[in-house]
Curated annotation (Swiss-Prot):
GO terms under biological process: isopentenyl diphosphate biosynthetic process, methylerythritol 4-phosphate pathway; terpenoid biosynthetic process
Lineage: Bacteria, Bacillati, Bacillota, Clostridia, Lachnospirales
EC number(s) per entry: 2.7.1.148
Catalytic activity: 4-CDP-2-C-methyl-D-erythritol + ATP = 4-CDP-2-C-methyl-D-erythritol 2-phosphate + ADP + H(+)
Domain of life from the UniProt record: Bacteria
Record: active site: K11, D137
Transferase found in the keyword field: yes
Record-given protein name: 4-diphosphocytidyl-2-C-methyl-D-erythritol kinase
Record-stated family: Belongs to the GHMP kinase family. IspE subfamily.
Length: 291
């Protein structure tokens, strides 16, 4: 095998809670993570030249060490003492800086692909331990599916597949700094924390309506204050028949869950021809863990 193509799937947070802050600045979280069928495509080809070369369809993306795919390649080369270089084509579809772990998923797929290409025989657990060096979301992006995420995001408990539904993704054209959101999050006795345990129970019972009623994200209190259009999108999606709508991660992406295909498609078509059309997607949950 001298070339490999992989799909790097996006994630949403069905629930996101922040428990507290560590002395080192990291935050302890409890999250329900869900992979969706929106993906980037990554093609990797080893080269005799030792350099790492990345080509992408987005002109503004860095193709050097500031790209997490490059960093993943460098980590893999150094860990397994590989002299070959890599040519990588990265076709982005997941919105960038959107709270959907697009970069982390690209890094995860890269590690998985290199493990296959060079037959380094690393288990999923081995790759996850390697991946956490790149970012807290990378281990989950290797695991995929439905999972409870704790610690700083690296402690993962796989859950049964969440009840499937139609998932409409809308990303408004604003930029959100994850660092800014966490730094400005105020946790006190008035903080409304998600019912994570209740959502786990709803998922285990395959109760879509109960699960949808419990979607919640403490980071909304920061991001929506600075970008009120997120709240407007949520309310509008509810008026289109969504069971619920929520900001994913630190934002600004909003997802809406539908149990009715026609309602989901109607909302999708309306948004597709509107100002958010380029960053609007209708998808479903992803269950399989195969790349």
């Amino acid at each position: 095998m001298d070339i490999i193509s992989l799909k790097a799937y996006a994630k949403i947070n069905l629930a996101l809670d922040v428990i507290g802050k560590r002395p080192n600045g990291y935050h302890d979280v409890r999250m329900i993570m869900q992979t969706i069928k929106l993906y980037d495509k990554i093609t990797i080809k080893p080269t005799t030249n030792p350099d790492i070369t990345i080509k992408t369809n987005l002109h503004f993306l860095p193709t050097n060490e500031n790209n997490i795919v490059y960093t993943a390649c460098k980590l893999f080369k150094d860990t397994f003492q590989i002299s070959d270089g890599f040519y990588i084509n990265l076709e982005k579809r997941i919105p960038v800086a959107a709270g959907m772990a697009g970069g982390s998923s690209d890094a995860a797929a890269t590690l998985f692909g290199l493990n296959e290409l060079f037959q380094t025989n690393q288990s999923l657990e081995d790759l996850m331990k390697l991946g956490v060096k790149l970012g807290a979301d990378v281990p989950y992006c290797l695991l995929r599916g439905t999972a409870l995420s704790e610690g700083i995001g690296e402690v993962l408990t796989p859950l049964p597949p969440a009840p499937n539904c139609y998932c409409l993704i809308v990303k408004p054209p604003v930029s959100v700094s994850t660092k800014f959101v966490y730094e400005n999050l105020k946790l006190d006795e008035n903080t409304k924390h998600p019912n994570i345990d209740g959502m786990v129970e709803a998922i285990e019972k395959q109760d879509l309506h109960q699960m949808s009623s419990l979607v919640s994200n403490v980071l909304e209190s920061v991001t929506i204050k600075h970008h009120p259009e997120i709240e407007r999108i949520k309310m509008d999606l509810l008026s289109h028949g969504a069971l619920n709508a929520l900001m994913s991660g630190s934002g600004p992406t909003v997802f809406a869950l539908f149990d009715n295909q026609k309602a989901a498609e109607r909302a999708f078509y309306e948004y597709k021809v509107g100002p958010y059309g380029k960053q609007t997607f209708l998808t479903r949950f992803f269950e399989s863990k195969n790349v």
